[in-house]
Amino acid sequence: MEATAQVREEDEETLLYGMASRQPGALWGGGKLLFAGLLTGAEFFRRDEVRLGRLTFQTADCQMDAEKKSRSFQDTSMTLSGLLEEILKDYPGADYCLSLPDQAIGRLLVQYRETDWEFLKRVFSEYYAPLGVFMGQEGIRIYAGVPELSGQWPWELAAVEKSEAEVRRFAAMGAGETDFVDFGLLSGSCQELFAALEYEGRTLTVRRLDWELKKGRLECRYVLRSKAGIGAYPIYPVSLVGIALEGRILEVKGNLVRIHMDMDDPYGGPDVFWFPYATMSASLDGSGWYYMPEAGDRVRVEFPDKYAQDALVINSASVYEAPSGGQDAMGNPAVKYLSNCAGQKMALGPQGVFVSAGASGLTVDNSGSVSIWGNNEVIIKAEGNVSFKAQSITVKGAEEVKAVNEAGTGAELTGELTLTGAEVLIN
């Protein structure tokens, strides 16, 4: 709403600095509150030697369009009414009217650098549902979808037109061509957005309105059409496409991960969505690379297209810090290693390959030597034969060396040599 009035020059500064930002304002007519809003702009100017002041008011929902926010809504069972309540809880006294089935959102929703109004407008546009406001009350009251508001008032038909472009654009809504015929009406009666009336046996709904006070007389201009033809074209989160958001792993299951996004820290929403984890290699038969991150690991969530539900976790971002006085696992870029929280590790370095599992391990040097060690035991077993072939073979035991087959035939070396068998031949 804009209000223009004549002002005295000496009052301009007092008015300009004396008005508080978002100061409430209202318009009454015939004992009825026609408009309630907040002051969002003030301008003083001269026209034909007359000094004028213009005040601009917007409905209270302008508070929802002031701050850019980033957060995720991971609970796919949340209903549309639950989403509205979650958003509107930041605005005391805010109310809403949901005029479409209260279904579960059924997908991941991400609000990324959007105001609450921009976000809700985008979400409901996916259902072809417009977002509107009720002007005739103080505070915030929004319409999600087109409500049923019956009524009748005096009017005069001013114009009739149809947009062929809208007929084609909104074909997916299921409305017919006649639903996109606009009726322009003039009236002295103030009606709200989505108000309805009967015209030639059909119900028309206000989709656009304009009021103007001229010489003490209020002129109202309305554009109405069939409710079935009032919709919002889907808006997609193009600002999300190609970005990667930081987070940390909470839980791992199969090839899926549950994460907490850093941007959700101020909001505390439930982290219940399972994201697919993109491995280095995967095929339909299950072959490829399976190495999942661990709880607590830092990760990035990538959004490859305009559909937030297609998001996937692409990699882990290391926050490793070298231990003081210890060996830095990332100290030498020439050494590539793979390890897990259980202590197993494989390293590929300039000198060879090293594999360890805490108290046992294997080393293959570039020099040609292979070392196998274990603090408990080392077992070499084959269904067929085990062959040792070398220029020299040395077998050492701290207390004894024993070679025995399952029949009990063999040799034992302690401080003495003991040979056992059904028959022992010594030449």
Write out the residue ranges for each language-model feature.
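Surface-exposed cap/loop segments at beta↔alpha junctions
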Residues: 12-95, 108-109, 121-125, 134
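Short, well-ordered loop/turn sites that connect or cap secondary structure elements
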Residues: 17-21, 190-192, 292-293
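Short, charged beta-turn/beta-strand-edge "cap" motif at the junction between a beta-strand
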Residues: 28-33, 90, 200-204, 302-309
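Short beta-strand-centered aromatic/proline hotspots
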Residues: 34-44, 202-212, 247
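Extended, domain-scale alpha-helical bundle/helix-rich regions
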Residues: 47-48, 78, 82-97, 101-228
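Glycine-rich, acidic and aromatic/proline-enriched surface loops and short helix-turn segments
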Residues: 60, 77-97, 250-272
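Right-handed beta-helix
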Residues: 87, 123, 133, 266-267, ...
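Exposed beta-strand/loop interface patches that mediate assembly or binding
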Residues: 205-212, 216-348
